């Protein structure tokens, strides 16, 4: 297996990114796919593109994908309450999402106090070394959901994680999601207005979580997601 990562930006502002793990014979297809994604993204033109390929040497951990639960009546406040995330912590997370800073990774907050627990500043925590081995999906929208579920599954597969809130920073994509070990993966429609780059990924955790081990799991452990 090989890890392939793409990051594209304009004047150091993040435009697009993608990542997966695949077999050698699939590398060329992913390189073409990520190249085209970078140069044809709705967020604008790029002046920098990085494509990185590494052989996966560490053992791969298998994770079962979070179930997709569709409920048009879901609200963030209700979901947060059901997963042990305080209203104050939820609002702090939304502040990070709505500010004008572009974070390239996730932000970790206390689910109780809303205090930021990671110290990565604008970089954030990057979930890497992952691939969705099997997925019952098709079409462009389902491709987005597949990638999002893979990330959500990894983020929520560690003791002490309460939930995750994600809002895309793509200009015209207004569907976000709220995911948790307890409630699964739930899309939230019209979570932001069209035409804005506001977005971000917030992870709500217990303050007693082994933060160093969690970050290492997200950033360095190879993870393969499968359907149940």
Curated annotation (Swiss-Prot):
It is an enzyme of class 6 (ligase). InterPro entries: BioW. GO terms for biological process: biotin biosynthetic process. Its cofactor is Mg(2+). Pathway: Metabolic intermediate metabolism; pimeloyl-CoA biosynthesis; pimeloyl-CoA from pimelate: step 1/1. It catalyses: heptanedioate + ATP + CoA = 6-carboxyhexanoyl-CoA + AMP + diphosphate. Its EC number is 6.2.1.14. Keywords: ATP-binding, Biotin biosynthesis, Ligase, Magnesium, Nucleotide-binding. It comes from the Bacteria. GO terms for molecular function: 6-carboxyhexanoate-CoA ligase activity; ATP binding; magnesium ion binding. HAMAP family: BioW (MF_00668). Catalyzes the transformation of pimelate into pimeloyl-CoA with concomitant hydrolysis of ATP to AMP. Homodimer. Belongs to the BioW family. This is 6-carboxyhexanoate--CoA ligase. It comes from Staphylococcus epidermidis (strain ATCC 35984 / DSM 28319 / BCRC 17069 / CCUG 31568 / BM 3577 / RP62A).
């Amino acid at each position: 297996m090989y890890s392939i990562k793409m990051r594209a930006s304009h004047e150091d502002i993040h435009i697009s990114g993608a990542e997966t793990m695949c077999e050698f014979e699939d590398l060329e297809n992913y390189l073409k796919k990520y190249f085209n994604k970078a140069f044809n993204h709705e967020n604008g033109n790029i002046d920098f593109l990085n494509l990185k390929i590494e052989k996966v040497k560490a053992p791969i951990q298998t994770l079962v994908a979070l179930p997709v639960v569709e409920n048009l009546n879901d609200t963030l406040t209700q979901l947060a309450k059901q997963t042990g995330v305080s209203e104050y912590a939820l609002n702090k997370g939304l502040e990070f999402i709505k500010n004008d800073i572009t974070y390239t990774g996730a932000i970790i907050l206390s689910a109780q106090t809303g205090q930021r627990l990671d110290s990565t500043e604008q970089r954030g925590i990057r979930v890497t070394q992952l691939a969705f081995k099997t997925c019952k999906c098709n079409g462009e929208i389902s491709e987005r959901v597949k990638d999002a579920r893979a990330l959500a599954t990894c983020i929520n597969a560690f003791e002490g994680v309460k939930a995750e809130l994600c809002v895309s920073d793509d200009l015209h994509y207004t569907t976000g999601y709220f995911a948790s070990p307890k409630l699964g993966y739930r899309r939230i429609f019209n979570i932001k207005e069209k035409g804005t780059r506001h977005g971000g990924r917030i992870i709500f955790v217990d303050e007693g979580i082994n933060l160093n081990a969690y970050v290492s799991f997200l950033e360095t452990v190879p993870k393969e997601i499968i359907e149940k």
